[in-house]
Amino acid sequence: MKIGTVEVPSQLVLAPMAGVTDLAFRLICRELGAGLTVTEMVSAKALCYQDKKSRGLLKLSPGEHPASAQIFGSDPVCMAEAACIAAEISGADLIDINMGCPVGKIVSNGDGSALMRDPEKAARIAQAVVEASPVPVTVKMRRGWDKGSINAVELSQMLEQAGVSALAVHGRTRAQMYAGQADWVTIRQVKAAVSIPVMANGDVFSAEDAVKILHFTGADAVMTGRGCLGNPWLFQQAQAALEGQPIPPLPPLAQRCDTAVRQIELAAQDKGEHIAILEARKQYAWYLKGVPHAGYYKEQIVRMNTLEDMYRITEGIRRDLI
């Protein structure tokens, strides 16, 4: 897949997820086969006001290319300025505009998926960012605002006309949030309506899902988010499936724990032990999903405060569950 001038080496893309796709997790996913990674979403206003924390979210790991920096906002001028700042700070190969986030505090400000209620404004923002950005621009969007306003096809054509180089389409409306089933038909319709690359997103939890969504929609790539939480090997598995090779099983629990520990150690190096451990309370638990008799250790994980706590818990898992 080629996005503007940027060559993406595989059809597998890691979706941006706030509080999840930090530098550490992106590095793990990249090593396991993700062809494109995207930062957590960053507020355009915060970048324009030189907020240090927001700028820190844009840090890429060495060799993390191609990579995309995602920004959100609803003011064309601020978004254009933020795109330039994000590209300069991160060294990202792409800038992604968030038009899909369904969270209330984002939508209430007119950002994220709220832009799907005003396609003309969304197109103006996209055009402003395209004209200002030194790198190609993409947009992540949803099927529509609700079942009464399914406008992904219309908006996708407007965004292409505005100069956007690729689209990622999630098959749910904002009203659905993450409930119900993703509608892949809309993604297929978007793919048929535009000439730029389309990434299919929604309900990709297995290698088989990745193959199915690509075949059904005709999309150029598959973007997965929640499906790889605790299972970054999904990229490895999906790549095998796409190549018609046997799908490798999930690694043994010992290896999964090693990967979880490494991810948390990388996060601690990047953002400090305290923040990394607070975030690890949910992240480590994801790696234990489906593991019999892991409840005791999940309870300990949500109470850990230091790296030493993490090492102690991991030793217990190795002793009792492996």
Residue ranges, per PLM feature:
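N-terminal small/glycine-rich loop or linker at the start of catalytic domains
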Residues: 1-13, 47-66, 101-111, 130-138, ...
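Glycine-rich, positively charged N-terminal anion/phosphate-binding segment
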Residues: 2, 17-93
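Alpha/beta catalytic cores of nucleotide-metabolism and tRNA/nucleoside-modifying enzymes
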Residues: 8, 12, 18, 23-24, ...
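Hydrophobic faces of well-ordered beta-strands that scaffold small-molecule active sites
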Residues: 12-16, 37-39, 67-71, 95, ...
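Active-site beta-loop-alpha junctions enriched in small/polar residues
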Residues: 17-19, 42-44, 72-74, 100-102, ...
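Alpha/beta enzyme core
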Residues: 80-111, 119-196
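Aromatic- and acidic-residue-enriched carbohydrate-binding clefts of CAZyme catalytic domains
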Residues: 116
